[in-house]
Amino acid sequence: IWVGMISVVLFSACKTGTSRSLGEGNRGNPLPDRPNILWLVTEDMGAYISPFGDSSAVIPNLNRLAKEGVVYTNLYSTSGVCAPSRAAIATGMYPSSIGANHMRTSSYSEVTGLPKYEAVPGPDVKMVSELLRIHGYFTSNNYKEDYQFNAPVTAWDENGPYAHWRNRAEDQPFYSIFNFTTTHESGLFEPYGFRNIEMRHYHSGDTTYKWEPGNLTEEETPVHVSKDQEFEVPPYLPNTPIVQRDMWKLYNNISEMDNQVGAILAQLEEDGLLENTIIVFYGDHGGPLPREKRLIYDSGLNTPMIIRFPDSWRAGTTDDQLISFVDFAPTLLSLIGEKPLNYMQGQAFLGDYQAKEERKYIHGAADRFDEVTDAIRAVRDPQFKYIRNYRPNQGYYLPLAYREQIPTMQELLRLNEAGELNAIQAQWFRESKPKEELYDCLADPFELHNLADDPAYQDKLKDLSLEMDRWLTNIGDTPNLPEIDLIHRLWAGDKKPTTADPQINISNGKVAIESDTEGASIGYKLINAIGEQSASWSIYKKPINLKKGESIWVQAHRIGYNPSAIIKQNLN
């Protein structure tokens, strides 16, 4: 049973009648021809759960997923923060190759003096959710987006706090995402209390359920983990009562998120969909604590992933292959039997088009975060990580107002000012950085001992430096490029481009639509004679048959551009 706060639903499942293999290296495993795909995405999630060695949180649902699925130990985000990483997930491209690397593109302009802008991928790039819609899938997102660009109206069948696979057509396969924000770093702020909106997961899809703004009080917030427990603290943080309280909040938040995950999975079982659904749980980057989030050490990039496949395939096993967020989009296509698109910079790790060789490296980047800017790049193989600092005269720690609401961050600053941090804890506050860093991530998992100047490791340093050069050239990344120059490059000028209005042509009872903007997605809605319209926008693929008295709304949108106006035309 999946364990949730509101209800426990007993097992009920059905199986599809046809199947495919999960790809090379996965022979003998049946996969439904059109598998449903359910993503359970939590925020700011380091390896703080028992399938990854930490048993402090109470997570019966994730433990069941791990028992019935595959634990992936080496998943890495492309950035230590959400929006750039989510851009990689949505497109299959590295954020710094499409202008999505600064956090965020559309905020803090009053501090930076920069215009608001969006990432601008090439004209052939579509969100992977739109690609799945094109292939007949119902796609829903509940409900965070945050891609560094505004999603076109064609991206989702449903997007919002009530979005749910239950709203699809009968027997239509689905790709549904549920986002859980209880584990976000803001969940460590004081006063402590769960966000009311997150309680929607216990009523998922129920449009009659409403929630109050703001948070529960601490007295109202469920206690899943004892406040009296003594928690292990990472060596880069001081072990003080303030930090212990933040560790309790972290584990209590994870335990609450597990309950919410259980509520969604209970609905999946209730609908009889467990055995033709691929369930993927992962975090949007590493942990929420200082010296975790926003950094490109493993504490900021490495995040848990568990995948449960139909029919208990590889149940209870561990997979240590390197996986990057840019691999998600090609893998989604591969799992539904479609070839990944050429522009995608990742590779499929499952499905019909699984890459013949496992990934040899993962890559990461850190640039502007809110009001402060750095320029760091990283490459990691299964054992070693190489980091290149493009602003070595600038310290590691940068004063970020949002992060300084975390009591642990305030404690670090207080103890640093008083000279009471030990040598490891004080590393982050050095006023300059070496140009290069090299870490043995197996012997030194917290990346505290830089080997870049050690003669014994010069061959590895050179190898990873060459790999970084290859990667930067391949994706067109120019680290430390002034952000205003990046904006002008994306816009091909000093003004944000706007998608051309779609042109509607009616002939012989059919509507043909086109846009002069290369690569624009075109969405449309049909409105019948009494004004009824569909809830979602359809993707225009070919001329549309008309019905007498209908009218049509059309919008074109290339990712990163302003969308066109909505063109409305009566079809009488």
List the predicted regions and their residue ranges.
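Active-site segment of extracytoplasmic enzymes that catalyze sulfate/phosphate-ester chemistry
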Residues: 20-24, 39-41, 46-124, 131-137
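Catalytic-site neighborhoods of secreted/periplasmic enzymes
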Residues: 88-187, 356, 363
